[in-house]
């Protein structure tokens, strides 16, 4: 597998996964792995990974969670290329496909998936300093897509009873819950991530069910990077 001069190949999980990433551009964070482990998955599920990036969530689901098939959708051409090469590098062509496209204009049919997972850009467009590296800026700030865009796509892609899982800042949970409900996505599972036992919550992982009944299960918290502190 050829890589470009500005890329690296990194190995994870005792050699189970090899990942092509840019040396300096947008590299996946542990958030993606925590989300991929959090989402409720059945072996027969058909999964869509929105904003797939280099493909890390799709790859983890295929290798560690053994899902039947994952389709990744990625806006940026360079990241789409990396995701496709990562699939080939790990010989997972029969379990993962990646499409370049915009989640605001879905290239898949309605009701395509049992599960949608998304590690969206969650820094508000006007909050903080915008990274001059465009790939990082799009991945981290609500520049190209908003929370409503993500929920619109999730609702469109899911079959009734299907599940959407995402990760978002803990201090925006009330906003996420309210907007999920306006999209008929009932919050069903919640797990909070703390930097350490002495700090306020930083992130939250939420799973909603399309047209689900009310009732929220709150899972034990995660501190730091959880089991991914050593990879």
Model-identified regions with their sequence ranges:
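Conserved SAM/SAH cofactor-binding pocket of Class I
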Residues: 38-129, 152
């Amino acid at each position: 597998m050829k890589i470009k001069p500005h890329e690296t190949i990194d190995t994870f999980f005792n050699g189970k996964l090899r990942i092509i990433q840019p040396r300096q551009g947008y590299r996946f964070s542990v958030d993606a792995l925590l989300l991929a482990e959090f989402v409720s998955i059945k072996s027969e599920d058909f999964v869509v990974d929105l904003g797939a990036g280099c493909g890390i969530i799709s790859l983890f689901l295929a290798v560690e969670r053994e899902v039947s098939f994952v389709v990744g959708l990625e806006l940026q051409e360079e990241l789409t290329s990396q995701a496709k090469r990562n699939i080939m590098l790990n010989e997972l062509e029969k379990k993962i496909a990646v499409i370049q496209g915009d989640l605001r204009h879905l290239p898949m049919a309605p009701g395509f998936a049992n599960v949608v997972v998304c590690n969206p850009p969650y820094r508000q467009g006007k909050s903080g300093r915008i990274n001059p590296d465009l790939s990082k800026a799009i991945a981290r700030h609500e520049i190209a897509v908003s929370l409503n865009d993500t929920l619109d796509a999730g609702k469109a892609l899911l079959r009734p009873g299907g599940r959407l899982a995402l990760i978002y800042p803990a201090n925006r949970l009330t906003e996420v819950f309210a907007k999920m409900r306006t999209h008929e996505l009932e919050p069903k599972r919640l797990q909070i991530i703390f930097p350490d036992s002495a700090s306020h919550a930083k992130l939250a992982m939420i799973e909603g069910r399309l047209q689900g009944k009310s009732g929220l299960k709150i899972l034990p918290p995660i501190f730091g990077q959880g089991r991914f502190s050593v990879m």
